[in-house]
């Protein structure tokens, strides 16, 4: 099962690598893009969840489901705004510091410390991300960089919350609550801030549909399912496939930077970190 979960997690991470490309192509406000990513996915998730057994959910469990949705909404909001407020490279690097916060969260909330091999895997993979986008990292974007780093904190919290929920909650139920709560939160913020919610271009509708179907339902759905079978720190490291995919696509589509020798070394280090993390997962049993 872990082998299958690992492959599904890789697939999910690859699919969400499309997110920065969609945000850059869409002309809408980043928070409105985040709202529609959730809103368009919600009807499909609701229909899918109808097949689940009808059973009550305890108040603490519902509170955790709501918290998970809020954490992901905050992550999406901060990350999407960071993509517009700073360079894609800066936003990608800073928002993918989540494994650091996941490791700290595991130590703080679960009473355990990740193994040395798991910590080494995290360091190697993050070093690879730094090399991958290092030449494109620019200073002078304080607000955007801060948003990118804050999004990593929220994403780390989201991953820990999903890992806790998946011990006894189906993936579809978690995804439904995340989309519902996240969409409501971002929608309210857009209304209060006076941010237009309706797309004005057919291309924007197409981009929003891809973000909802491919990245939210497909990508996050795969990740949510896989996290029930894998350790949080391991999952967080594997998800660093996402910025590798995003960097390669940005280079191919927008000529955003150059995939030279150091970038290739960085991508290989990320893969090496994933291999080490997988070894740590196996050693942990």
Residues covered by each model-derived region:
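Hydrophobic transmembrane alpha-helices of multi-pass small-molecule transport proteins
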Residues: 45, 49, 72, 104-105, ...
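Transmembrane alpha-helical segments that form core, pore/gating elements
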Residues: 16, 42-45, 102-104, 122, ...
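Specific alpha-helical transmembrane segments that line the substrate/conduction pathway
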Residues: 32-43, 80-113, 151, 232-252
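Hydrophobic/aromatic residues within transmembrane alpha-helices
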Residues: 26, 33, 37, 82, ...
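Hydrophobic/small/kink-forming positions within alpha-helical transmembrane segments
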Residues: 14-17, 21, 39, 46, ...
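Glycine-/small-residue-enriched transmembrane alpha-helix faces in small-molecule transporters
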Residues: 1-35, 67, 78, 137-164, ...
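Specific transmembrane alpha-helical segments of multi-pass solute transporters/efflux pumps
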Residues: 15, 51-89, 94-95, 129-131, ...
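Helix-helix packing/entry segments at the starts of transmembrane helices
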Residues: 13, 91-97, 161-184, 216-252
């Amino acid at each position: 099962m872990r082998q299958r979960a690992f492959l599904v997690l890789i697939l999910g991470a690859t699919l969400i690598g499309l997110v920065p490309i969609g945000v850059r192509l869409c002309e809408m406000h980043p928070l409105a893009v985040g709202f529609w990513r959730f809103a368009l996915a919600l009807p499909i998730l609701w229909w899918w969840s109808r097949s689940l057994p009808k059973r009550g959910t305890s108040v603490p469990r519902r509170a955790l489901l709501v918290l998970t949705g809020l954490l992901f909404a905050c992550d999406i909001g901060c990350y999407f705004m960071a993509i517009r407020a700073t360079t894609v490279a800066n936003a990608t690097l800073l928002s993918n510091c989540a494994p650091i916060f996941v490791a700290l969260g595991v130590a703080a909330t679960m009473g355990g410390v990740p193994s040395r091999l798991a910590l080494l895997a995290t360091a190697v993979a993050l070093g690879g991300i730094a090399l991958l986008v290092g030449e494109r990292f620019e200073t002078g974007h304080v607000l955007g960089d801060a948003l990118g780093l804050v999004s990593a904190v929220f994403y780390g919290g989201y991953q820990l919350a999903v890992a806790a929920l998946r011990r006894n909650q189906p993936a579809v139920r978690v995804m439904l609550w995340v989309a519902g709560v996240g969409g409501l939160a971002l929608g309210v913020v857009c209304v209060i801030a006076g941010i237009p919610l309706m797309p004005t271009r057919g291309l924007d509708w197409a981009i929003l549909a891809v973000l909802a179907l491919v990245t939210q339902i497909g990508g996050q759905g795969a990740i949510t399912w896989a996290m029930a079978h894998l350790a949080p720190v391991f999952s967080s490291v594997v998800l660093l496939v996402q910025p590798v995919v995003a960097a390669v696509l940005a280079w191919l589509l927008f000529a955003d930077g150059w995939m030279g020798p150091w970038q290739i070394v960085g991508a290989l280090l990320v893969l090496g970190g994933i291999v080490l993390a997988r070894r740590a997962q196996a050693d942990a049993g």
